[in-house]
Amino acid sequence: FNPFAAGCANPGIPVDVSGNKLPQSPELSYSIGLNQDFIGENGTTRARLAYRYMSEREGTVYNQPHLQIPEHKFFDATVTYRPNDGNWFVRLEAKNLADDRYIGSWYLASGLQGGNKFATVTDPRTWGISFGTSF
């Protein structure tokens, strides 16, 4: 008798996943941005518009169609002001301007947890302000 040995009534059925695509690994992912500087008497304002793309990808190692994660497309924008006579900046930013929501990832619970599937959802449109300095 070994009190630390855990027996398992059903060890499961082996599944061959060789040749399957890696989960959470898109075939294509990129971002592109446009910057424009506006030089004024008191400082420089930089505007940036960016586009982020990630192609569809597998949600799990089993490559099941109902667990695929759809492609993601996001537009982001920032406006940064830097004064000519200072070593600081202030930045306004917005991410996911279109407020698009996607499945971000899948999580499959074990049979002990009922075998349910859970998903994370990408962030909604977010706004922010930041301050910075250099020294």
Predicted features by range, described:
Residues 50-60, 81-135:
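C-terminal beta-signal and adjacent terminal beta-strands/loops
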